[in-house]
Amino acid sequence: AIASGGDEQGPDDVVFGVLPLFHIFGLNVVLGVSLFVGSAVLLIERFDPVSGLEAVEKHGVTVVSGPPTMWAAWAGVPGVDPGILSSVRMAISGAAKLPVEVAQAVEAKFGIELDEGYGLTEASPVVTSPRGTGAPSGSIGITVPGVELRIVDAQGEDVLVGDAGEIWLRGPNVFAGYWQDDDATAAVLTDD
């Protein structure tokens, strides 16, 4: 499902569902995967750091996905029991770059290592995952099955390892184009 390396989400999981379902992260990663694999989803109407932590503990949530701002808010709650997230076995950060300081604060406070992948709405959204790879904190891991990824220069040629470039990808999860907007589609998609 959302992870690779044998530690996937499954029917015994309880998923924290606080992300808005109008966003691809909430719709596909949280709700869609949960429905597909049979996980229970604890739907939360509005994020509040304290009541969110209490809900995770009360309902035995095992999978939490959220943006760095959510994780930072949880790490910033004063006087919270460090074991309040002890039921969580998968902790995923997405929707924005995860600052190293936030990852470190969450690990120091709760003993949880955050996994940060890479994705975008146009790729439904997951492209890479560090789960099961041993990738260090700050790495987005490797491509998920079926996705091919290249980093290229301005001419579309592959760059050397360590050089900056633009991410190009393809796979069955990549969209066919923007609805009724051929110009926008042509600006981001190539024939190959």
Language-model-derived ranges and their functions:
Residues A1-V14, F22-V63, V77:
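Conserved AMP-binding/adenylation subdomain of ANL enzymes
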Residues P67-P68, P172-N173:
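Beta->alpha turn/N-cap motifs
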Residues R150-W168, A187-V188:
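Conserved beta-loop-beta connector loops within the AMP-binding
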Residues D48, D153-Q155, D181, T185:
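Acidic/polar helix N-cap motif
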